[in-house]
Amino acid sequence: MFRALARASATLGPQVAGWARTMATCQLLVAPPEALLRPLSIPNRLLLGPGPSNLAPRVLVAGGKQMIGHMHKEMFQIMDDIKQGIQYVFQTKNPLTLAISGSGHCALEAALFNILEPGDPFLVGVNGIWGQRAADIGERIGARVHPMIKDPGNHYTLQELEEALAQHKPVLLFLTQGESSSGVLQPLDGYGELCHRYNCLLLVDSVASLCGTPIYMDQQGIDVLYSGSQKVLNSPPGTSLISFSDKAKNKIYTRKTKPVSFYLDMKWLANIWGCDGKPRIYHHTTPVVSLYSLRESLALIAEQGLENSWRQHREVTAYLHGRLQGLGLQLFVKDPALRLPTVTTVAVPAGYDWRDIVNYVMDHFDIEITGGLGPSMGKVLRIGLLGCNATRENVDRVIQALQEALQRCSRNKL
């Protein structure tokens, strides 16, 4: 043993000497940041924008639990619980159902990276920022993107889509159920059936709408559905939900090329999430604590019941609409049937700078509301009633804040 140690020392001698010289000649040039030597301080704020939302107390507790390993059997059970929860809120029996280690953008990329190949025709409903993003990602992976552009606040009819499907013959159609940048709710009944008549898959973004308004993945013929954790689910940002129909799964498994992303390769993700019936093998380190939180947020919805959650958002948002109109404000989406029950858009009142209103509400009331986003920038104010934040008490608080802001903020009378 001693001879072996001596031989190892002789072999490593020059290398060890080099390390010693490096340590002797190099010095720390960056001091510990003073900011990190102070305690973390977070304001207590009511988040009534389009998301993220405040965390439900049970979700907050889950985020403080101790780590376990991402490949432990207990973690796999938590992942199985999450999968069943996603199947419930999506109303699907799809085996290929899982959570993505990343926000809603990650789920959108996972959908497009796995379904589309270079040269595939891709039809995109662009009536807000999320359609813009989908078209952008499609172009980046070499799809032939055909955008159907509409002004913010408008939706797509079956007739319009049928004409576009017949013209472009896409393999995939993208629609946003809840366009949070404009506050419009896209109808979905009959759209999956229409797509399938033209041999096209239907991809739907439900990030801002899930659990706030009905969606039935299987019954509505949706082939790929994704959502986020930080809206009605009241969970931290950083995880997202996704599911693929058998038709979509077949498209994935018969690709001619590999998906452009290894991290979002659905064949790998299907395995780590127990969707392929094979022993799970390491792909990436899943965000263990975030998955605790997601599991608990789905449990809360399961306990409340989807229909009760839908009713809560519909009734509280109707109350908000009445209070806003009582202030003389105009709702941006004119047709009540097309108003998103989770994110309400208000036309910026004449003469006001929307930034003044948003800043006043934040500075004086610690309430977040936001302006528009993408095509709706400068046109609207956005108020979100998401999950546990969807209460009449919160409506009264934000109305009081808006009323004072309209009285105190400067107004251009020209």
UniProtKB/Swiss-Prot annotation:
Its EC number is 2.6.1.44, 2.6.1.51. GO terms for cellular component: mitochondrial matrix; mitochondrion; peroxisome. Homodimer. A motif (Microbody targeting signal) lies at residues 412-414. The keyword Cytoplasm does not apply. This is Alanine--glyoxylate aminotransferase. Transmembrane segments: none annotated. Belongs to the class-V pyridoxal-phosphate-dependent aminotransferase family. The keyword Mitochondrion applies. Residues 1-23 form a transit peptide. Its cofactor is pyridoxal 5'-phosphate. Pfam families: Aminotran_5. Keywords: Acetylation, Aminotransferase, Mitochondrion, Peroxisome, Pyridoxal phosphate, Transferase, Transit peptide. The modification N6-acetyllysine is found at K247, K256, K334. It is an enzyme of class 2 (transferase). Substrate binds at R382. It comes from the Eukaryota. The modification N6-(pyridoxal phosphate)lysine is found at K231. The modification N6-succinyllysine is found at K247.
